[in-house]
Amino acid sequence: MAGGGAAGFFAAIACAEADPLAEVTLLEATTHPLAKVRISGGGRCNVTHACLDPRDLVRSYPRGSRELLGPFHRFGPAETVAWFKGRGVELKTEGDGRMFPVTDDSATIVACLNDAARKAGVRLRTGSGLKAIEKAEGPLGARLKATLTGGEVVMASSVLLATGGGKGSVGFSLARAVGHTIVPPVPSLFTFHVDDPRLTGLEGLSAPRVGIEAQGTRLRETGALLVTHWGMSGPAILRLSAWGARELHAADYRFTLVVNWAEPRRTDEARRELESDRAEHPKRKVSTANPFAIPARLWERLASGAGIPAEATWASVSNEVLRALALQATASAFAVSGKSMNKEEFVTCGGVSLAEVNMATMESRLCPGLYFAGEVLDIDGVTGGFNFQAAWTTGWQAGQAMASCQGTGRSS
């Protein structure tokens, strides 16, 4: 099994537990297995999401939603929670549905996976990766010849590719070598570069509910937005980046983002509220009389953006300027000039085409004995634990299926 990340570990454990006689070897090319698990979720590890109905769960996957429905019925968030609980790790649910270990420490998850692998008899080899695979008949039902990076050749009844996504994934070249189609990988879950005077100095400011859209597209999201020193981040931005991964890549990440800071109000509704405030409180300063749930410092910037001086009162605001303020509140346009990686959850879309994979077993339809799990597949979810859930699910399915084709003395 190639890839010592979440999917690879889960597959190796599932296989070894299902067939104690199988010889299961897990290869990790680096010396740091489970590295992504360690740093995800700000070091807390967002294990999964409290969305228990598979029909609802699949809606959080821009790629792979249809294909994951069956797998999630077999092993979804409920099974994930039970799996970790059965190994002494309790998970908690936060207000937004994200689930973390009660320790708030990813080391808990890392230790659990390492311990489960050791107890199941998985042989972990770090600093050793997979260099090549080819179909070959061997003893005891071996179907594949695997060449490791150090030159060692191993005959195996089954091989798993759980080597992750991204342009540099060795799994892509290995899959391509046996005939698989690779959907070109592009970034997903990224933040936006925005250089705008309305945001200067507001780093760390959070707007709890905004509406955003990429102008000229159908890409729209609602949720929290965070102002950063490079531009914009937060759940709404990350979800939009996931659903628009290919479209925004094609635009070279240069587009106009329209933000409704007064969501769910439309511009006309906001204008009427502002007119009412002007009539009722003509002597109040506009910069401090914020009728919406917009952070005070941001409201001051929006008022300035509408051409309203800091000391101006409502009485001095003309209808034209008031309309401009309503637009600033509900349809602020920001020029996006690029992207930055989301440090807590770095994901790509693209990978091995799902049409060429049996999603009930994760086995290749083109190369019997070859299996896939995790981000090497053309599957990705939005932020919130969904990508880890896909890793647990596909890893578990692959491990179970690989165990079913093992026999005494066979290796995987």
Named regions from a protein language model:
Residues 16-42:
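Glycine-rich FAD pyrophosphate-binding loop
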Residues 126, 301-380:
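A glycine-rich dinucleotide-binding beta-alpha-beta segment and adjacent secondary-structure elements
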Residues 1-26, 395-403:
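N-terminal Rossmann-like FAD-binding beta1-loop-alpha1 element of flavoenzymes
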Residues 42-93:
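Glycine-rich active-site loop/strand segments that organize a redox cofactor
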Residues 126-142:
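A conserved short coil-to-beta-strand element within the FAD-binding core of flavoproteins
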Residues 2, 27, 130, 153-166, ...:
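Short hydrophobic core segments
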Residues 29-33, 39, 47, 51-54, ...:
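An anion/pyrophosphate-binding glycine-rich loop and adjacent beta-alpha core
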Residues 158, 162-178, 379-409:
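A conserved FAD-binding loop/helix module that cradles the flavin
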